[in-house]
Amino acid sequence: MINMLPEEVLLEVFDFYVDPTRRYDRVEAWCTLVHVCRKWRNIVLDSPLCLKLQICCHPGIPVREKLDIWPALPVFLAQYDKDWQPTWGVANVAAALEQNNRICHIALLDVSTSNMEEILAAMHKSFPILTELWLHSEDETASVDPDSFLGGSIPCLQILYLTHIPFPGLPNLLISATHLTNLQLFNLSNSGYISPKAMVSCFFALTRLEILTLAFKSNESFSITEH
């Protein structure tokens, strides 16, 4: 019965079903639809922008094999728990980061210091469609190179969340973050010190910023939230 509906109606139904704004585990809900029948598969894969299709990658899957199966859709790279494998987990993240022109979302939390430093080393290139970056190291990593990290420019980034990531050159990078709405930096230390003057200067470019959190290791914090 449902296949009697016009394609435009089916597309509206699919759009409601695959809406990725609800939960990250719904990012690949569209995969269920494409396996129902050829008609549904064609409708879904012919409408990647309308349905906001994305491929979800995480450290626990063979990334290269997965990316070879599907069309070149935007990549959602995420891991929200400590289920990291010592070797192939980082290798899978690195394989996903090779697709820097396709990555739209990165969320890697509770990552060991050694693994995080390997990941940061693989991010010294441009990520032109990246809108969200969440990086949480279990302990402090080496300082990030401000000139090469993310290619030195983040024009599409909307959310930036860093924990235990020293980044003294962050203000230089933020100058390009004209779409940033949410900036949260936790466990800031002396090695990642950013002068108040430098931060204030870069804030003039962040005209869309709504949420700002700066939390220091000394338990002193400065937080501003606007709605």
Task: Give names to the regions the model predicted.
Residues 3-17, 128-133, 203-214:
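Conserved long hydrophobic alpha-helices within structured protein cores
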Residues 6, 18, 123-124, 138:
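Residues that cap or delimit alpha-helices
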Residues 55-57, 77-84, 107-113, 134-141, ...:
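Concave beta-strand-loop units of leucine-rich repeat
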